[in-house]
A protein has these predicted regions:
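S-adenosyl-L-methionine-dependent methyltransferase catalytic core, i.e., the SAM/SAH-binding region
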Residues: 1-174
Length: 174
């Protein structure tokens, strides 16, 4: 069921627009590749600062719909106020589950995913993604999910940490 994914869905009417925290690189080129059509169904899998979402919405007609996913609660401040948009606070790995839920399973016309860590995450000392600031060693995209990086570093064995660095950090000499 959808409850097991710890998600929240809100429409734009329930959330106000806030200033963005990230400017997308190659914004127009990325959205051009989506070939926005009248009545289409689209997904922005990484809402973040909302830059791609706003550009997609600007190209859509009134019959189209856009679903925006983000597991980071900070992204909620960037949700555009538009009835053609539905925000889903969840990891995009559950895309197919949500599209089935909304009746759009197999009907998404284009998907955009701006993968990676945004400048917002590096600029927030509480997130623990940057060497520039003193702060907690958190490093989670979803602040409610799993253990922090500090908990992992302080509880896992040296062997297990070496495996993690090898598999996910591409440190072949770990």
């Amino acid at each position: 069921t959808l409850k097991e994914y710890n998600w929240q869905m809100k429409t734009c009417a329930q959330i106000t627009t806030a200033e963005t925290y990230h400017v997308p690189v190659m914004l127009h080129e990325a959205v051009d590749g989506m070939d926005i059509q009248p009545g289409g169904i689209y997904a922005d899998l990484t809402l973040g600062g909302g830059g791609h979402t706003r550009e997609i919405l600007s190209r859509m007609n009134q019959n189209a719909h856009l679903y925006g996913f983000d597991q980071d609660e900070d992204a909620e401040q960037n949700i555009p106020s538009d009835e053609r948009f539905t925000f889903v606070r969840s990891n995009f790995r559950y895309l197919s589950n949500f599209m089935r839920y909304y009746g759009a399973d197999g009907k998404v016309d284009a998907i955009l995913a701006d993968l990676g860590v945004s400048s917002h995450h590096f600029d927030d000392s509480e997130r623990g993604f940057s060497f520039r600031f003193d702060g907690k060693l958190d490093m989670r995209m979803n602040k409610r999910a799993g253990r922090t990086a500090a908990e992992l570093v302080n509880t896992l064995s040296e062997e297990k940490l070496a495996d993690i660095f090898y598999l996910y950090g591409e440190l072949k000499n770990s």
